[in-house]
Amino acid sequence: MRPSQRRPDQLRAVMITRNFTCHAEGSVLVEFGATRVLCTASVEDTVPPFLRGRGQGWLTAEYGMLPRATHTRSAREAAKGKQSGRTQEIQRLIGRSLRAVVDLSALGERQIVIDCDVLQADGGTRTAAITGACVAVHDAFRKLVTEGKLPYSPLREFVAAVSVGMFQGVPVLDLDYAEDSGCDTDMNVVMTGAGGFVEVQGTAEGATFSRAELNALLELAESGIRRLVEAQKAAIDRN
């Protein structure tokens, strides 16, 4: 039995609240159970030096956790003077995931900066961040279209992410902290709404996993991501 009492194929309660803050072009609070992440998408009329003069846009991401997002307080990385390897890995993953579904050539010389700030962590912060950031980017593009700055949205399709793992010999979906810290295999899967894989990160923690278990985990992730994309679309349709 899972610590959360959920079925193996059951997601945590998912909530996507749009327009959560008033300044960013796109702003979303995404909740996967007790995990809560604020995702904003900001539009900048500039691009990195390597893209200047090419008529193409860019999308990048930053990720961070509030000091008391976890059970015990962690020092702000700004106070330490450098980002951890984990932070750099996650923000690069978020950027790659969103660039996979954005037509950068349709942006013009603009940059979208995604900021994902973890307010409360209970496992799956990177997957929640990707799922929420996609909706924030959608809203930022909608604003640009409404203002007449773009003829159409450069967002080609949705992208979402979920964790899966082997917990006590059973493939389970959307691990919370208790499951993540006690599982034998931990995997993060990023997919598009059309079913294409963007990234698969899998690690054997306590024991190796078989090809059959890998296939079962991927099928479980695919099912979960379909439901997450439905939640993204439902959040957009509400307003």
Swiss-Prot record:
Belongs to the RNase PH family. Homohexameric ring arranged as a trimer of dimers. Coiled coil: none annotated. Pfam families: RNase_PH (PF01138), RNase_PH_C (PF03725). One of its GO terms (biological process) is tRNA processing. Keywords: Nucleotidyltransferase, RNA-binding, rRNA processing, Transferase, tRNA processing, tRNA-binding. This is Ribonuclease PH. It comes from Aromatoleum aromaticum (strain DSM 19018 / LMG 30748 / EbN1). InterPro entries: ExoRNase_PH_dom1 (IPR001247), ExoRNase_PH_dom2 (IPR015847), ExoRNase_PH_dom2_sf (IPR036345), PNPase/RNase_PH_dom_sf (IPR027408), Ribosomal_Su5_D2-typ_SF (IPR020568), RNase_PH (IPR050080), RNase_PH_bac-type (IPR002381), RNase_PH_CS (IPR018336). It is an enzyme of class 2 (transferase). It comes from the Bacteria. Phosphate binds at R86, G124, T125, R126. GO terms for molecular function: 3'-5'-RNA exonuclease activity; tRNA binding; tRNA nucleotidyltransferase activity. Phosphorolytic 3'-5' exoribonuclease that plays an important role in tRNA 3'-end maturation. Removes nucleotide residues following the 3'-CCA terminus of tRNAs; can also add nucleotides to the ends of RNA molecules by using nucleoside diphosphates as substrates, but this may not be physiologically important. Probably plays a role in initiation of 16S rRNA degradation (leading to ribosome degradation) during starvation. Its EC number is 2.7.7.56. Transmembrane segments: none annotated. It catalyses: tRNA(n+1) + phosphate = tRNA(n) + a ribonucleoside 5'-diphosphate.
